[in-house]
Regions:
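Transmembrane-helix boundary motif in ABC transporter permease subunits
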Residues: 62-92
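Transmembrane alpha-helices
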Residues: 120, 124, 156-189, 222, ...
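Generic hydrophobic transmembrane alpha-helix motif, especially the helices
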Residues: 93-129, 136-137
Length: 251
């Protein structure tokens, strides 16, 4: 309860500071919070904000699923096969430092300006986070569990799907949901070209027309969605770990 109260104070303080800044600055640069809220209500009433969220959500979802579908098997391969680890580990280690936005013009040249380009960009943005995260999750697995499995007659493959995958599931799920939130932060880039719907499209169109209040509104919606994903990630991970602990106690 105290934590919730402190967060409410922080939220109100941010809104108050924003309000003071808007009163002492040109609204072209710092819009009034009331105008931003009114814009949000208009888009809620006409349903445009839900259409934008739907299109953005689907783009991020497709990219995130592809990222996970590649990152998890590759992570298991790198963790369990020495040759793959020697070859791929140096590449994976530098992934987190890649300038993701630098790929945008290249992807336009390679795939054009349709949905393939947008999803490819979001795939890169999410994959460079997911791939190292999967390896970190696997490295947290207790090696004694794997050794015990091998001792009682499990094959290497059995230790993967009976020990490693269940042990890393909460952490990987947490990484996946966080990756989803990260994908939303890149929408303002990938939806600026040839997009008719989406939160990034709202930002691009509003910016071109000098409607800073709409830009702020779309950014706030993206931030709120990311916060929701972070909360879902925390709750899901907590429940999975609690279930795993109970299962271990039963065993």
């Amino acid at each position: 309860m105290k934590t919730f109260f402190k967060r409410c104070i922080l939220f109100v303080s941010i809104i108050f500071i924003w309000y003071l800044c808007s009163k002492n600055a040109n609204h072209l640069f710092v819009p009034d919070p009331k105008d931003v809220f009114n814009d949000l209500m208009i888009l809620v009433k006409n349903g445009q904000i839900f259409i934008a969220i739907k299109y953005s959500f689907l783009r991020v979802l497709i990219a995130a699923i592809i990222s996970a579908a590649i990152a998890i098997p590759v992570g298991l391969l790198v963790y369990n096969v020495g040759l793959a680890r020697d070859i791929l580990n140096p590449i994976i280690n530098v992934m987190r430092y890649l300038p993701v936005t630098a790929f945008y013009p290249l992807l336009i040249m390679w795939f054009g300006i349709d949905e393939t380009m947008k999803i490819s960009f979001l795939f890169i943005a999410t994959f460079v986070y997911m791939m190292p995260s999967v390896l970190l999750c696997l490295e947290e697995v207790n090696q004694d569990l794997i050794d015990t499995g091998l001792t009682i007659g499990m094959s290497k493959l059995q230790t993967i799907y009976k020990i490693q995958v269940p042990a890393t599931l909460p952490s990987i799920l947490n990484s996946f949901i966080m990756m989803f939130g990260i994908g939303f932060t890149y929408l303002s880039v990938c939806e600026t070209v040839n997009a008719k719907y989406g939160l990034g499209y709202i930002i691009q169109q509003s910016s071109a027309r000098g409607k800073t209040d709409m830009v702020f509104m779309a950014i706030i919606v993206i931030v709120l969605i990311s916060i929701v994903f972070d909360y879902v990630s925390t709750v899901s991970c907590t429940h999975l770990r609690a279930h795993e602990t109970k299962a271990n106690l039963v065993c």
